[in-house]
Regions:
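Post-HExxH zinc-binding segment in Zn-dependent metallohydrolases
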Residues: 123, 130-173
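Beta-strand-enriched, solvent-exposed domains that form extended recognition/catalytic surfaces
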Residues: 1-13
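Short active-site segment of divalent metal-dependent hydrolases/proteases
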Residues: 116, 120, 140, 192
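Alpha-helical scaffolding within the catalytic cores
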Residues: 11-14, 77, 154-155
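Pan-zinc metallopeptidase signature
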Residues: 165-199
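Juxtacatalytic substrate-recognition/specificity segment
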Residues: 15-132, 161-164, 174, 178, ...
């Protein structure tokens, strides 16, 4: 038996730089080091929040790949809805995001969101399937700190107009239609928030 070896493969399309802290490796090729450090700090805060709030901990180092924008991200992945800003691959401890310096505030939330998916994936592996989408996404939005005002308004309007989506429809994936997808995230957060605060 040979000793375990580690190989890191980086998309050779870009000249990647790396910052490391705790169990996080943040890879970026665009933006300043201060921008990357800000995102790394947000990821560290997300790890801390998930650990104390939900008992979700990183089992091994997680690699965060920051593309310069969502267009660059979409060029690197296939078959994702147009509203996709990031993806998590829990089996490989990888997060990919498209974050420009002008979207730093959104990026801080998005990095915590996707990082939460990796942590949930570690805790909930099953040969029978994954956790319901509403639970996974609801936990991720909860870890971000809650809904932004526009998302809260959309949820409030759906409650008022009796146009909420069924929980069953939130269990197996979200719509490719952006407005339905955004409502799906908001509803999922609302369900998870209720469960956490009630039980």
């Amino acid at each position: 038996v040979s000793t375990q070896q580690t190989v890191t493969w980086l998309d050779s399309e870009h000249n990647w730089k790396t910052l490391t802290a705790d169990k996080l490796n943040l890879h970026y090729y665009s933006g300043t080091q201060a921008f990357a450090q800000d995102l790394l700090n947000a990821a560290k805060s997300g790890l801390d929040f998930n650990s104390t709030q939900s008992g979700l901990n990183a089992e091994s180092p997680i690699d965060l790949y920051i593309f310069a924008n969502t267009n660059d991200l979409r060029d690197a992945i296939l078959y994702e809805p147009s509203w996709t800003g990031g993806q998590a691959f829990a089996d490989h401890d990888i997060v990919i995001l498209g974050i420009s310096q002008s979207d730093l505030e959104w990026g801080r939330d998005a990095i915590v969101h996707e990082l939460t998916h990796v942590l949930v994936g570690h805790l909930t592996f099953s040969c029978l399937g994954g956790v319901p989408t509403w639970l996974n996404e609801g936990l991720a939005v909860y870890s971000e700190g809650g809904l932004d005002p526009a998302s809260q308004q959309q949820l409030d309007d759906a409650i008022k107009d009796d146009t909420l989506l069924t929980v069953r429809s939130l269990s197996a994936g979200f719509s490719e239609v952006p407005s339905k997808a955004y409502l799906s995230y908001s509803q999922s957060y609302s369900i998870v928030k209720f469960l956490i605060e009630t039980y």
